[in-house]
């Protein structure tokens, strides 16, 4: 919840001071494999929204309204990938890699455009989630409980499992056991690189 992030960032004395507004954060970590893991597009008092541009794929994104007054804080957790992950040398291999995982998320959902979601505690312990706790997912048209590792590359899953506890050491409550991971954010950067000159 946003209130937990406010408490962690501002401290008990100032957590509810209206003039400060909803707290944000920026986190980064380098996994043992060398992959970068970082928070992206942190939306204080925000929500997770649908952002698919193609049929049969799920893409999530985040946003905050002007007041930043929604009950949840959210951000994308991004893990770096590169041409070695794409499995091909074609100029559009990155686009196909992106589409593949977006389709996997759609298939995993099994319920149309509802996004796969899992509680942080269960993701870290590699077990399915049975129900939601006190944190209400904000994604519309809704979420379904699934093991999100099924729509992520193994290397990405491993890097996230390494980074989330580290982030929790930086921001108390970041890995709240009932926090919700909603999959999949694939559009943080372009899968095609154009070199100039």
Predicted regions and their residues:
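Residues forming the flavin
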Residues: 1-197
């Amino acid at each position: 919840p946003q209130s937990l992030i406010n408490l962690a960032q501002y401290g008990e004395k100032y957590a509810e001071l209206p003039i400060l507004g909803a707290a944000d954060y920026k986190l980064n970590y380098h996994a043992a494999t060398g992959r970068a893991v970082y928070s992206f597009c942190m939306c204080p008092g925000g929500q997770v929204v649908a952002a698919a541009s193609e049929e049969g794929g799920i893409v999530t994104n985040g946003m905050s309204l002007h007041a930043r007054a929604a009950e949840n804080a959210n951000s994308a957790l991004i893990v770096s990938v590169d041409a070695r992950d794409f499995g091909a040398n074609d100029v559009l291999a990155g686009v196909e890699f992106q589409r593949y995982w977006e389709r996997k998320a759609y298939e995993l959902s099994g319920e149309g455009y509802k996004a796969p979601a899992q509680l942080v505690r269960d993701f870290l312990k590699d077990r399915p989630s049975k129900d939601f706790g006190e944190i209400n997912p904000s994604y519309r048209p809704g979420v379904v409980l699934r093991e999100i590792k099924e729509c992520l590359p193994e290397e990405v899953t491993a890097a996230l499992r390494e980074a989330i506890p580290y982030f929790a050491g930086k921001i108390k409550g970041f890995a709240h056991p009932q926090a919700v991971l909603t999959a999949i954010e694939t559009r943080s950067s372009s899968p095609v690189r154009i070199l100039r000159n």
